[in-house]
Amino acid sequence: MSPSILGRKIGMTQIFLEDGTAVPVTVVQAGPCHVLQVRSKDRDGYEAVQMGFEDKPRRLAKRSERGQVATIESKRSKKRSAAGIEAPAKADCEPQRFVREFRGSSEANVGDTLTVEQFNDVKKVDITGTSKGRGFAGVMKRHNFAGQRATHGVKKCHRHAGGTGMSASPSRTFKGKRMAGQYGNAKVTTRNLEVVRVDAENNLLMIRGAVPGPNGGFVSIRQTNKVG
């Protein structure tokens, strides 16, 4: 599996290169991440690594989230161990807020911790996040329509889309016609972004350009598979 990690977008700033060039970068807190499960082809039909980022208090976690990590010693677990029943291996950590799977074979084991150091030799990455939700937006904002004339011949329709249908034939609106509607709050992947700096001490990645989502939003980072 190519180097992959989960993180949280912090915000944008600029840093200076050795030649004095100012570079706009997005700072991402990347890891540390706990390996929760390792998928295998024999058992699951595909190979992948499931990892989690950022601890979540057990009292706030759902049962499904608590089930992904090792349980605190309870009466039930003591009875099982006394009966010789072995539970599957689970990560010895708190429930995780952000959990994702990355496809591919890996040498990682359940309970391992993945850090940002794996990106020391990586130059380009793909970043996936949830874009900012903008609510119900018109066609000029959502689809970059030019709008109608600002003056002559237009009454209160300056930002309208105009006609959407046809005449007598086919007498309907085609599917996929671009109209006003929900904009944003969707899964977005920005590809081939340059890694400018890796701060392993503070678990930070500095990436040239914009990263999808608001400040504080969760993101998935993976080495790009694009060539060139």
Curated annotation (Swiss-Prot):
Positions of region (Disordered): 157-176
Pfam families associated with the record: Ribosomal_L3
Organism domain of life: Bacteria
Gene that this sequence comes from: rplC
SUPFAM superfamilies in the record: Translation proteins (SSF50447)
A GO cellular component annotation in the UniProt record: cytosolic large ribosomal subunit
Function: One of the primary rRNA binding proteins, it binds directly near the 3'-end of the 23S rRNA, where it nucleates assembly of the 50S subunit.
Keyword vocabulary terms for this entry: Ribonucleoprotein, Ribosomal protein, RNA-binding, rRNA-binding
Example GO molecular function: structural constituent of ribosome
GO biological process, one term: translation
Family to which the UniProt record says this protein belongs: Belongs to the universal ribosomal protein uL3 family.
Classification lineage: Bacteria, Pseudomonadati, Planctomycetota, Planctomycetia, Pirellulales
Keyword Lipoprotein: no
The keyword Ribosomal protein appears for this protein: yes
Quaternary structure (record): Part of the 50S ribosomal subunit. Forms a cluster with proteins L14 and L19.
Record-given protein name: Large ribosomal subunit protein uL3
